Amino acid sequence: MDIIFYHPTFDTQWWIEALRKAIPQARVRAWKSGDNVSADYALVWHPPVEMLAGRDLKAVFALGAGVDSILSKLQAHPEMLKPSVPLFRLEDTGMGEQMQEYAVSQVLHWFRRFDDYRIQQNSSHWQPLPEYHREDFTIGILGAGVLGSKVAQSLQTWRFPLRCWSRTRKSWPGVQSFAGREELSAFLSQCRVLINLLPNTPETVGIINQQLLEKLPDGAYLLNLARGVHVVEDDLLAALDSGKVKGAMLDVFNREPLPPESPLWQHPRVTITPHVAAITRPAEAVDYISRTIAQLEKGERVCGQVDRARGY
C-alpha cells in the first residue's frame, strides 16, 4: 500500500512517521512536483492539480473539516480527480470538542453581558446592567452537520432554547428543527444568537447578508465559525452600526489573513480570532485516517465521505 502526503504548512516529517507507525504495511512518502509514481491513497490540503490528476486512487483524504478548496479546484480542473475516487474529510478529529469550547464560551460571554461591561470599562464607567433571561436567549445553529450537532449538545447543558436550520430536517432531542429556504425566515425570527456552521457551497456563499440579518431580532449576536465567504462583511458592518446586530465574533473571513485596513479590526462590537476555532489535531487525525483506510481495505462502509454534488 502506497500513501502520498501533501500539506503546505504541516510538519510533513512528523506526519509521515506517525502514519508509518499507525499503518505499518504502508509505504508513506511526501509528494513533490514531478512525482508520478502510483499510489493508493492521497492525504492532502490545497493540493496541486498534478498531484492527483490521472491517478487510480482508492481514496483521497482532505486534512481538514472542509473540502471547498479541493472542490473549487476540481470545478476548474475536472481532470484532477476521477469521479470514481471517494473523497473524505476529517469529520470530527477533535474539532467538535474545540467548536464546543469556542461556542459555549462566547455564548456565555454575551449572555452575561461581558461585552457591554468591557465597553463600560473602557470609559471607566461603573453601572450594573439588567440580566438577560435564558428563555429569551434562543440560540440558532445555521448548518446542522456533525459539528453543528456537537455544538447543540454542549449548549443544551446550559438550558438555552435551541433551534437549527439545514437543507433537510433533523431529529435532535431538545432542538427545534427548520429545513429549506421556505423555513429560514421563521428560524431566524427568534435567534438572539446565530451560530454559523454551514458548509461552503455555491448555495451558501453570501447567505449572511442584509436580507438575512434584517430577519433576526433587534440586538442579535453573530458567531461565524464556518467560512468567511458566508458573510457579506459590508452588510454585517452596517447591521452592527445600526444596532440591529449587537455583536459579532468572527473566526473566518473573505480574505485571510484579514487585511490591516479592514474596518472589522477596529469595530467596538467585533471580536476577531485568526481561524483557530477548530484546528486539525494531528494525532487524532492520523488515528481517524488509519482506521478509515483499514475499513476501506476490508470493503466496509465508512463515514465522512463527501458528496461532491452537495459540496460536503
Curated annotation (Swiss-Prot):
Purpose: Catalyzes the NADPH-dependent reduction of glyoxylate and hydroxypyruvate into glycolate and glycerate, respectively.
Subcellular location: Cytoplasm
E.C. numbers: 1.1.1.79, 1.1.1.81
Claim: Oxidoreductase is one of the keywords in the record: yes
One GO CC term, this protein: cytosol
Keyword NADP among UniProt keywords: yes
Reactions it catalyzes: glycolate + NADP(+) = glyoxylate + NADPH + H(+); (R)-glycerate + NAD(+) = 3-hydroxypyruvate + NADH + H(+); (R)-glycerate + NADP(+) = 3-hydroxypyruvate + NADPH + H(+)
Gene: ghrA
The protein's name: Glyoxylate/hydroxypyruvate reductase A
InterPro entries reported for this sequence: D-isomer_DH_CS, D-isomer_DH_NAD-bd, GhrA_Enterobacterales, NAD(P)-bd_dom_sf
Family label: Belongs to the D-isomer specific 2-hydroxyacid dehydrogenase family. GhrA subfamily.
Keywords, in A-Z order: Cytoplasm, NAD, NADP, Oxidoreductase
Top-level EC class as recorded in UniProt: oxidoreductase
Catalytic site positions: R227, H275
HAMAP family on file: 2_Hacid_dh_C_GhrA
Gene Ontology terms, MF aspect: glyoxylate reductase (NADPH) activity; hydroxypyruvate reductase (NADH) activity; hydroxypyruvate reductase (NADPH) activity; NAD binding
